[in-house]
């Protein structure tokens, strides 16, 4: 089945034939806007675990508005644990610490998946995939069946190659350019130039997707207990999307860390979001000055 798209130009009207997207199966991952309400990562049933918030509400749930990461987690090397501890002390004292998103930097993997960012995958004419994120018009370009260049130049969103493994989309990313605001998650785990990220996306039953999101939101909480995507489609008859994310960074982690991130379909239309750069950070009625570069990084 094909669908027709109508394009207007100064030369007249052009009809372009585009492939239709199936509701399920491999192609059901693309052409859909996905979103989630909780921050950070869902744990795997076993193995190394992502950091947990040490600040708990009276009911035992995590307070996503005050981020004190478990720096004793054995997945962290001592240097990384010290950074998380320092940032946690700032948060516990009521002070914020900046990250790539609130500083209008590229929200690159794996931090992309620790945020509430919506996204949509769009197939390109040459078979590659573009991923649009709901933050500052961030875009990733996935070269399908490609390889990383031998002389890799670090890029704001890294270098990504992908492949289909049955009905799963697998994306391999290296070469993310780091700066003072780059981190793995919202607890401030540092990220080095050695970070290697493998994303494995697959469609899952809608009931399971809702259950996974509800369970994690209840356990770890969302900002203020209420900042949510109002456009999440409540129809559990629609497939959800589960990301199995593996992060390897020998300068930060003691071994590979694999986590889950569950997304559901959004009903709202794509909305452009413009990020305005700012030399200060506002956190709990306090303005915090931020470091400034002497020279441009381009």
How should each PLM-predicted stretch be described?
Residues 1-8:
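Bacterial N-terminal signal peptides that target proteins for export
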Residues 2, 16-19, 45:
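Position-driven detector of the extreme protein N-terminus
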Residues 8-17:
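Bacterial N-terminal signal peptides
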Residues 22-298:
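PEST-like low-complexity, intrinsically disordered acidic/proline/serine-rich tracts
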